[in-house]
Amino acid sequence: MAATILTAGCGKPSTPSGGAVAPPADNTAMAATPISQPALTAWRQGDKAGAVAGFLAADWSAHPLFAADSALSLSESQFKALSDADRQAKSTELTTQLGVFKQLAAAVTQAGQEAAAKGDPAQARKCFTALKQCGAALAGPDSSSLVQLVGQALSKRADTELGKLPQ
């Protein structure tokens, strides 16, 4: 019993009596890689193409969007509950992190515009659709007001660009 608890706590499946491993009943209990992490990591490493590819591959309807320790992961109520000093520190962190994220989103927009200019509306649509899905995710109720505003702006930009593409 103790071995089962210890191995389950490490994220390793236990195999009672050597039988097949059953999948966990609740996948949300496992720590998931934040959706934005692969794209943001590539961006920070200077890999623009990899960052855009990671952004396009992301499932923006999944969670968590950002790492738990990121200011971007705070809801508005969590942000307001911080002490004045912590709120100021998180505000600075939030502004910096949003700046990086907006640069990545601009690169995705640019990739879509370049695809459209080269006569590849399918790739352009993929870029703008990912941008719109990201915007919708950021604009959700689990985000801070500032992150929601950025999400709304991304969705609006995506709609504008999608409207320019041939049907």
Regions found by a protein language model. Give the residues of each.
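Sec-dependent N-terminal signal peptides
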Residues: 1-2
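Short, conserved catalytic or interaction motifs in soluble domains
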Residues: 12
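Aromatic-rich surface patch/π-platform used for binding flat ligands and interfaces
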Residues: 15-167
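C-terminal motif of bacterial Sec signal peptides marking the signal peptidase cleavage site
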Residues: 6-9
